């Protein structure tokens, strides 16, 4: 990684160093890979400048032989009484989808690979009380939803935020912050006050491991296709529609979809076939078990659809009216290929 979260003001100096290493020193020719984790919109104007479009575009223009990735913890609580507790309200960051859209748009045409950093740790800290936002992950569906959504947007590399909680906490405490920064992480100490007592793998470790295995199986299929953009489907259930300023970008091979809850549908194409990665964009409920029922209309020229779930293919029959129904689990995604 070249840099974590560079500001717009740092770009010119950053690009000079990158060019020296990448080209003058021959790192690119030698096969080395470079990436940089950019800020997301919610970092604010001090970091990204006047607009996220300007921030991402300048990076993509200056440093084309890199991968673009960005930091975003999309799930958060807003405290109702000044402290983090059960009265807090669960929300989804409304810039999450639009940030992915901006990164994708600026990478396309420049040959830049796009990489997603998946939030895999929970933040509960006095450091965040200035915004009353507490970034969190507390179920596997919140990890898998991020991964499947990134794949639907055409991201081709995945990475995860994973921390040893006390190490990051100690760094912040050294700066006068006594809040517990990353309270729940994939690796936890048995005794945070005595590191000699060792550590253990938490549920977060298994959640990431399981999700990554699913993503790897799916990507083996997706890698044979070319991404054509996404459709953002507003669910019929009141209280959904949380895509913010993001818009549908797939006008090449769009599919008609109606769903109970919000849905992201990534479009793909390969050798005359259309593919669709349908992701349940319903904000994960407390149980993590709520499914999204969707009707897909592919047309009467199709007789069936191959449906991949966790990399395993099944065949779904298309009705005479050209439709078929599917249930998509909380935080899950399925890949669909209509067949004549």
Label every PLM stretch briefly.
Residues 1-340:
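Glycan-processing catalytic domains of CAZymes
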């Amino acid at each position: 990684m070249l840099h974590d979260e560079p500001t717009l003001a740092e770009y010119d100096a950053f690009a000079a160093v990158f060019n020296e290493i990448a080209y003058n020193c021959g790192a690119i020719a030698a096969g080395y890979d470079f990436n940089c984790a950019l800020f997301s919109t919610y970092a604010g104007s001090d970091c990204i400048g006047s607009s996220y479009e300007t921030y991402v575009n300048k990076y993509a223009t200056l440093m084309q032989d890199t991968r673009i990735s960005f930091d975003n913890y999309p799930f958060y609580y807003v405290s109702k009484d000044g402290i983090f507790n059960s009265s807090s309200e669960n929300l989804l960051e409304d810039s999450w989808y639009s940030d992915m859209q901006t990164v994708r748009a600026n990478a396309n045409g420049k040959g830049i690979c796009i990489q997603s950093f998946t939030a895999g740790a929970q933040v509960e800290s006095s450091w965040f009380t200035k915004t009353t936002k507490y970034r969190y992950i507390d179920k596997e569906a919140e990890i898998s939803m991020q991964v499947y959504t990134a794949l639907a947007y055409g991201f081709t590399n995945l990475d995860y935020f994973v921390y040893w909680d006390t190490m990051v906490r100690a760094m912040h405490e050294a700066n006068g912050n006594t809040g517990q920064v990353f309270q729940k992480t994939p690796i936890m100490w048995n005794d945070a006050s005595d590191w000699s007592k060792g550590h253990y793998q938490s549920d977060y470790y298994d959640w990431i491991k399981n999700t990554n295995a699913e993503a790897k199986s799916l990507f083996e299929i997706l890698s044979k296709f070319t991404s054509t953009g996404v459709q953002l489907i507003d669910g019929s259930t009141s209280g959904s529609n949380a895509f913010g300023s993001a818009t549908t970008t797939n006008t090449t091979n769009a599919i008609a979809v109606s769903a109970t809850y919000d849905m992201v549908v990534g479009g793909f194409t390969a050798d005359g076939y259309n593919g669709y990665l349908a992701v349940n964009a319903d904000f994960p409920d407390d149980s993590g078990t709520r499914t999204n029922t969707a009707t897909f209309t592919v047309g009467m020229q199709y007789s069936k659809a191959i449906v991949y779930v966790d990399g395993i293919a099944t065949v779904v029959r298309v009705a005479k009216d050209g439709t078929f129904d599917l249930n998509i689990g909380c935080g899950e995604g399925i890949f669909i290929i209509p067949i004549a």
